Amino acid sequence: MSYFNDNDFDVFKSCNILRNESDIRQARKVIKDKLLDINEDINQKMNDMGLYHHKDTAHIVSLLTPCEFNHGKVNWIGIRYGKHPSEIDELNFGADKEDIYGFQKHCCFQLDVCYSGVEMGIFHAVPRGSVDRMYCHQMLDSGDADFKSRLIKAVEGIVGYGFVWNVGVDGLSMDDFKGESFVFDEVEDVGEEFVKWYSKVDCEYRYSSLLCHYGRKDERISSIEGIEDEFFKVVERLRGLYDVMCWRKL
C-alpha cells in the first residue's frame, strides 16, 4: 500500500474542504501524522542545508481546520522549510502580524498532499505582505541587472523537471484575474520569458508557488522513503532559484 492512499487524497474532495466535523478532522490528522513522520526523518538534513520549519512545533504542519488564514477551506495539508526562526523574527520586527502567519510571509520549500496527489517545490507568496515577493519586484522594477541575470540563470537551471509556477487569486482580489500558470518545460527563452511573466502576473492579493506535481499512482511517492528522496531532489534542483529570490538581511 502506498504511503499516502486514496482515503488520504479524498480528504481534499470539494465536498470536504469546507467541513469541520469530527470525522474529517480525524482524517486530516492521519495526514498530519504521516507528514510529521516525514519531518522527523528529514528535519536534520534540512537544517544542515540551512532550512528550518516553523519555530512553533504546533505549526510544523499547516492548519487542519477551515479558518481566516486558509480562507475557510482545507484543500491541502503540508510542511514547509525556510529561513531560520531568528532571521524571520528579525525581519518581522515591529510588524503587526500574527506569528503563525509570519513564517508564511517568507519564501519556503513545501511538501503537501492534495486531492490529486503530492506536490513539492517552493511556496513563494501569500496574497498580502509577502516579504520575498516585495524584494523580487523591487529588484526587477529598479532595473538591477545583476539580480535579473542571476534570476534568469537560476530559472534556466530548472527546465526539464516538470516544474510549474502557479499564481492564484485571493478572495479579496478586486479584479477579474482567475489564475495563470507558467510551465517551464514548454517555453523557449525561458529565463527572459519568465521574468516578463512574473513581473506582470505575480502581485499583491495573489498566491504564488512553484511546484512539481506527483499523481496519486506515481511510483516516486509510493513509499515514505521515495517521498523523502524526491523532496531532497526537488530542494537541490530549486535551491539556486530559492536563494536568488529570497531577501536576506546582510
What are these model-derived regions, one by one?
Residues 1-57, 169-250:
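Long, solvent-exposed, polar/charged low-complexity segments
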Residues 42-89:
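Glycine-rich, compositionally biased intrinsically disordered regions
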Residues 28, 62-63, 93-96:
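Short secondary-structure boundary micro-motifs
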Residues 15, 67, 107-108, 114, ...:
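Generic recognition of cysteine residues
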Residues 73-96, 108, 159, 165-200:
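Aromatic/basic-lined ligand-recognition segments
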Residues 19-22, 29, 116-189:
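Compact, glycine/acidic-enriched structural inserts
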Residues 72-152:
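Aromatic- and glycine-enriched beta-alpha-beta binding-site module
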